[in-house]
């Protein structure tokens, strides 16, 4: 699972979930990508589950890039505990995903395989998403 090596502060405020993604909106490494169309928190477990679903379908072919990272801790108090008495313990790590953000990128496989692999990954995630190509978004090309 993904989590930061070290953090300056153990607990944070809840992040904003309004607006569109400011960065990471283009397919930069691969040929195809999975782009979020709604806002949500994605946990490190959900990212790992989606990655496994994609790589199993592609069977050692192609390359996968994970374009999101869970930097933000989220806390939870134990069950049947009264309100107050401080903030709860860190339960896990989340990545805040807003519309337009590229979640995963794939290269080295045919379009049909990439489309199906990203579709399987999208079923593991709490956001609605769509399949995009590098040419459609105007991403940089690797040609000199």
UniProtKB/Swiss-Prot annotation:
Q: Which PROSITE patterns match?
A: RIBOSOMAL_L16_1, RIBOSOMAL_L16_2
Q: What keywords does the record list, in alphabetical order?
A: Ribonucleoprotein, Ribosomal protein, RNA-binding, rRNA-binding, tRNA-binding
Highest taxon above the source species: Bacteria
Bias (Basic residues): 1-19
Q: Which residues form the signal peptide?
A: none
| Biological processes, Gene Ontology terms | translation
Q: What SUPFAM superfamilies does the annotation carry?
A: Ribosomal protein L16p/L10e
- Matches recorded under Gene3D superfamilies: Ribosomal protein L10e/L16
Q: Where is this region: Disordered?
A: 1-23
Q: Name one GO molecular function term.
A: tRNA binding
Show the Pfam families listed in the entry. Ribosomal_L16
Cite the CDD domains for this sequence: Ribosomal_L16_L10e (cd01433)
Q: What residue ranges carry the coiled-coil annotation?
A: none
- Give an example GO cellular component term for this record: cytosolic large ribosomal subunit
The record ties this protein, via InterPro entries, to:
Ribosomal_uL16, Ribosomal_uL16_bact-type, Ribosomal_uL16_CS, Ribosomal_uL16_dom, Ribosomal_uL16_sf
**Role summary:** Binds 23S rRNA and is also seen to make contacts with the A and possibly P site tRNAs.
Q: By its UniProt entry, which PANTHER family does this protein fall under?
A: 50S/60S RIBOSOMAL PROTEIN L16, LARGE RIBOSOMAL SUBUNIT PROTEIN UL16M
Q: Which family does it belong to?
A: Belongs to the universal ribosomal protein uL16 family.
Complex formation: Part of the 50S ribosomal subunit.
The protein's name in its UniProt record: Large ribosomal subunit protein uL16
Q: Which organism is it from?
A: Staphylococcus epidermidis (strain ATCC 35984 / DSM 28319 / BCRC 17069 / CCUG 31568 / BM 3577 / RP62A)
């Amino acid at each position: 699972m993904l989590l930061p090596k070290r953090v300056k502060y153990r607990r944070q405020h809840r992040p904003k979930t309004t607006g569109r993604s400011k960065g990471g909106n283009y397919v930069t490494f691969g040929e195809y990508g999975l782009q979020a169309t709604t806002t949500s928190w994605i946990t490190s477990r959900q990212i790992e589950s989606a990655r496994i679903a994609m790589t199993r379908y592609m069977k050692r072919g192609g390359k996968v890039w994970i374009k999101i990272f869970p930097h933000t801790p989220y806390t939870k108090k134990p069950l049947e505990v009264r309100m107050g008495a401080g903030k709860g313990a860190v339960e896990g790590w989340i990545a805040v995903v807003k519309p337009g953000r590229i979640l995963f990128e794939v290269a080295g496989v045919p379009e049909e395989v990439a489309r199906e692999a990203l579709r399987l990954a999208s079923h593991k995630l709490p956001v609605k998403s769509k399949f995009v190509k590098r040419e459609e978004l105007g991403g940089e090309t690797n040609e000199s």
